[in-house]
Amino acid sequence: LQHEYPNLFPSDDAKLVAGNTKEAGSYLWEMHNQNELELDFRPLSMSIMYHTPCHLRALDPNYNGLKLLQLIPGLNVLNADSGCSGMAGVYGLKRENNRTSLRVGWGLISTMQKTQAQIGSTECASCKLQMEQGVDKPTIPPIALLAYAYGRLPEVKAWIQTRHDSLVVP
């Protein structure tokens, strides 16, 4: 929306929408920096492995979903810091690209296999698929974890306890 919308629909309205569009985590972090974010989180006693998606690094080099999650008391947030997931949107879902996708994302996949963290977390649905390759740990969006810590989205508890079949031989 920020970059392509004004090109697709060249109008003042499109520019207005593009100029006021933010990724949810960036918006919440901005609120926190302005002391406008309520911090009445319930403690979450668990460890998570957080992955910053490539598109978020490109959109906002200063964005740090890791710091946003670290506001939740009791949550041990580990940084995957393993590079690209290799998915590139739907690229990695195509049969002819699957091997390349797995090779590119192997750093992240192996980090998830080795971690003691109970769950993974990322903003990107494509990265989520790759993070769940070869592990039985769920990957949950940061915004859902924040909502759960606020006492919302009670179904997150079931998501946290969900185990997946290993899709890739470890």
Task: Indicate where each model-derived feature is located.
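Iron-sulfur cluster-binding electron-transfer modules in prokaryotic oxidoreductases
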Residues: 1-170
